[in-house]
């Protein structure tokens, strides 16, 4: 079969069956077969199917964010505390307490988040579904969720699985004596696996060869946007890189993978030290587990990894480590033991590399998970990294003498771990939400709503400013299209397009952008109206569209929701925002350097992150091209003789059989459209543009907007899609995507 990195030209990818040296196996649709068996390189438009109501079994009109606010949180805590110590014979609690198991469940749910594309995290309850429910790093978490079923059953639609999975770990730590920073409810459940997350190219669990391909041994060259060192792990191999028990080398993997989860060195050390204060790992025997949940027999009812060992004989990771003598209590014993011993390598009963104190140190100090026996403490290779790595070592040595600092840092890092993918604080619900805020939350001060008279005055000032349609629309698009639905970051609210790093992004054309910002700030200062820069940018885009529509014969008013606020540079985490920089923007025919996928694939991913459907993506492309909204004022894809007018010319000319398309002589990935009769060059276009004429589904959409009776529909649909993008981040007024 073709390699995942092969990207034939659009036409070839869609008209040639896949070639291979082995017979192709085509399965019926109910077994997972699809057109992609024949054309594996075709763009995946299913990512843009935005109709969750079809698969949502909850009644129409149900709003989880309203329902969860009726939850009796105090009673939930009491019920949870009782559950934690009510050991079940079918899965006995280690040390008589399920708390450590629930902490691992919560951590592994939230820890899939990666900052590069904002995907992963706990916010949709994806740990219930494949592939996460069957990752080797999640062995036995199926039992943790099943243990929680009585609580989910009791509280029903008032408590989502998404919230319960992460609440459980948070409350478990409180139950064991730790003071957390708080907790926010508000994560609605999804009802099917996310199909838009790339977890890696490897086809075997714990594989890593593809994600480090071409790295030449440099463990910091992990493929983007991946956040784990191996397929099926949350972060790193606890035995060390590729199983090599080297704590210094393991620290490199730790720093890289936790950094991709937006954690710095202090936060990383706090999470590892704090999290491993509780519980144990499981590798008590050499029994081999049965198949994971997705491959398990029907009679196992959704549980996987079956084996005869439970309780003291449990096998999950194969590592048999109990870190402290108080595994169900918050204290500083992890660091006391880590620094109070020298360590020697040995094998777990399951054959995994782990560490124990030399000279039989701390013998018989650690309780057995079941019964009354005692054993010695043990550590993972990655635990020793917290002492032996110079940076982590400096941090943790201080905590050894100042445990109150560890508690504070762990509380903050744990809260960040659980909430990093929740988006703005306006989405935080419930009585446990902390009043304190942090830089990583992208705080936006509240804005002031504008009156209709104020809006009219400002629109007049913008129209008279000398700024062109292209400048106004392009600037609004650059601001708003930084939004991504994956972790609900970015967008126009906050006015951060005038701040670093967005002000300097190549994709934002800094010199041109600075001129527009200067003019808009002049209007802001001279208008006498208390208007935010963020509102002014979006309003400017609307003025540009209304002007372009009028030039095309349409008298329209683009809906506008005021009240955006302006953030300051001090409220902006430059490093964290740098991950929002678009490497490509197909809506403006911008392609940056070093992309690992052709532009058409990047477009689909961008549209998905903007929470657009395929029709919305299509009409936005056509409208922006008609307005001449391109990077660098390029004519690429501007398939009209009247740029700046909101017409459907783009689709008319794209579907015109009088135009013949061919690769440009420069072989630069662009195409030339010539008159089929005269050979005269009429247009130039990109791979993105030709996608809408060559892909059968997108051509069907393009034809709708090219039809003679669709001019009104085109304008109406373009405006609606535009407003969706402009308001995608408006969680402050309940309009967010």
Swiss-Prot record:
Cofactor note (record): Binds 1 heme b (iron(II)-protoporphyrin IX) group per dimer.
InterPro entries named in the record: Catalase_peroxidase (IPR000763), Haem_peroxidase (IPR002016), Haem_peroxidase_sf (IPR010255), Peroxidases_AS (IPR019794), Peroxidases_heam-ligand_BS (IPR019793)
Cross-link type Tryptophyl-tyrosyl-methioninium (Tyr-Met) (with W-107), residue numbers: 235-261
Post-translational modification: Formation of the three residue Trp-Tyr-Met cross-link is important for the catalase, but not the peroxidase activity of the enzyme.
Active-site residues per Swiss-Prot or TrEMBL entry: 108
Residues carrying the site annotation Transition state stabilizer: 104
Cross-link entry Tryptophyl-tyrosyl-methioninium (Trp-Tyr) (with M-261), positions: 107-235
UniProt GO molecular function: catalase activity; heme binding; metal ion binding
Cofactor(s) listed in the protein's UniProt record: heme b
EC number: 1.11.1.21
Domain of life from the UniProt record: Bacteria
Region named Disordered: 1-33
GO biological process: cellular response to hydrogen peroxide; hydrogen peroxide catabolic process
Catalytic activity, reaction form: H2O2 + AH2 = A + 2 H2O; 2 H2O2 = O2 + 2 H2O
Record-linked NCBIfam families: cat_per_HPI (TIGR00198), PRK15061.1 (NF011635)
Subunit record text: Homodimer or homotetramer.
Family under the similarity heading: Belongs to the peroxidase family. Peroxidase/catalase subfamily.
Protein name: Catalase-peroxidase
Organism this protein belongs to: Mycolicibacterium vanbaalenii (Mycobacterium vanbaalenii)
Organism taxonomic ancestry: Bacteria, Bacillati, Actinomycetota, Actinomycetes, Mycobacteriales
Gene assigned in the entry: katG
């Amino acid at each position: 079969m073709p390699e995942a990195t092969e990207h034939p030209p659009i036409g070839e990818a869609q008209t040639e069956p896949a070639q291979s040296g082995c017979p192709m196996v085509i399965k019926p649709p109910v077994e997972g077969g699809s057109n992609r068996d024949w054309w594996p390189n075709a763009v995946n438009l299913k990512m843009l199917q935005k109709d969750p109501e079809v698969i949502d079994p909850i009644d129409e009109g149900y709003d989880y964010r309203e329902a969860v606010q009726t939850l009796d949180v105090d009673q939930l805590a009491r019920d949870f505390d009782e559950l934690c110590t009510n050991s079940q014979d079918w899965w006995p609690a280690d040390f008589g307490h399920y708390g450590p198991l629930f902490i691992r469940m919560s951590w592994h749910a939230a820890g899939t988040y990666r900052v590069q594309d904002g995907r992963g995290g706990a916010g949709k309850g994806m740990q219930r579904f494949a592939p996460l429910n069957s990752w080797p790093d999640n062995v036995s978490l199926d039992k943790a969720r099943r243990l929680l079923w009585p609580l989910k059953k009791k509280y029903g639609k008032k408590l989502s699985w998404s919230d319960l999975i992460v609440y459980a770990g948070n409350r478990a730590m409180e139950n064991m004596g730790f003071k957390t920073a708080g907790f926010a409810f508000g994560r609605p459940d999804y009802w099917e696996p996310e199909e838009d997350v790339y977890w890696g190219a490897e086809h075997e669990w714990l594989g890593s060869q593809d994600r480090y391909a071409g790295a030449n041994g440099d463990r910091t060259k992990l493929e983007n946007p991946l956040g784990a060192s191996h397929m099926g792990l949350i972060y790193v191999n606890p035995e060390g890189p590729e199983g090599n028990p080297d704590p210094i080398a393991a620290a490199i993997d730790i720093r890289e993978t936790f950094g991709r989860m937006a954690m710095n060195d202090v936060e990383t050390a706090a999470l590892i030290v704090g999290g491993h204060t509780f519980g144990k790992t499981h590798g008590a025997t050499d029994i081999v587990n049965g198949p994971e949940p997705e491959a398990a027999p029907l009679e196992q009812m959704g549980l996987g990894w079956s084996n005869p060992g439970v309780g003291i004989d449990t096998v999950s990771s194969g590592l048999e480590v109990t870190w402290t003598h108080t595994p169900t209590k918050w204290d500083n014993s992890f660091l006391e033991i880590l620094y109070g011993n020298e360590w020697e390598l040995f094998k777990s009963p399951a054959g995994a590399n782990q560490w124990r104190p030399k000279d039989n140190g701390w013998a018989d100090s650690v309780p057995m998970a079941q019964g009354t026996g005692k054993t010695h403490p043990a550590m993972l290779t990655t635990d020793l990294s917290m002492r032996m790595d110079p940076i982590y070592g400096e941090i943790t040595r201080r905590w050894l003498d100042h445990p109150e600092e560890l508690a504070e840092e762990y509380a903050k890092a744990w809260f960040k771990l659980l909430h990093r993918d929740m988006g703005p604080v306006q989405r935080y619900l419930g009585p446990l939400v902390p009043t304190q805020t942090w830089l990583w939350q992208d705080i936006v001060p509240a804005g002031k709503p504008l009156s209709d008279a104020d809006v009219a005055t400002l629109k007049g000032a913008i129209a008279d400013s000398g700024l062109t349609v292209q400048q106004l629309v392009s600037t609004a698009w650059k601001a708003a299209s930084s939004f991504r639905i994956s972790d609900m970051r970015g967008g126009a609210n906050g006015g951060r397009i005038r701040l670093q790093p967005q002000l300097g992004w190549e994709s934002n054309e800094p010199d041109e952008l600075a001129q527009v910002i200067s003019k808009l700030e002049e209007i802001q200062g001279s208008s006498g109206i208390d208007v935010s820069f963020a509102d002014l940018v979006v309003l400017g885009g609307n003025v540009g569209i209304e002007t372009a529509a009028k030039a095309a014969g349409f008298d329209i008013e683009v809906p506008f929701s005021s009240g955006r606020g302006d953030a300051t540079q001090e409220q902006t985490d430059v490093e964290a925002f740098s991950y929002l920089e678009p490497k490509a923007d197909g809506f403006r025919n911008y392609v940056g350097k070093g992309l690992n996928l052709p532009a058409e694939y990047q477009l689909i991913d961008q549209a998905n992150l903007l929470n657009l459907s395929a029709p919305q993506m299509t009409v936005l492309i056509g409208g922006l091209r008609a307005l001449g909204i391109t990077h660098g004022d390029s004519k690429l894809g501007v398939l009209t003789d009247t740029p700046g007018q909101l017409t459907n010319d783009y689709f008319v000319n794209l579907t015109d059989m009088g135009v013949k398309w061919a690769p440009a002589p420069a072989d630069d990935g662009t195409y030339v459209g010539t008159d089929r009769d005269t050979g005269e060059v009429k247009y130039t276009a990109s791979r993105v543009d030709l996608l809408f004429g060559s892909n059968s589904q997108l051509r069907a959409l393009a034809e709708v907007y090219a039809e003679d009776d669709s001019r009104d529909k085109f304008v109406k649909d373009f405006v609606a899609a535009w407003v969706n993008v402009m308001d995608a981040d408006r969680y402050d007024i309940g309009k967010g995507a």
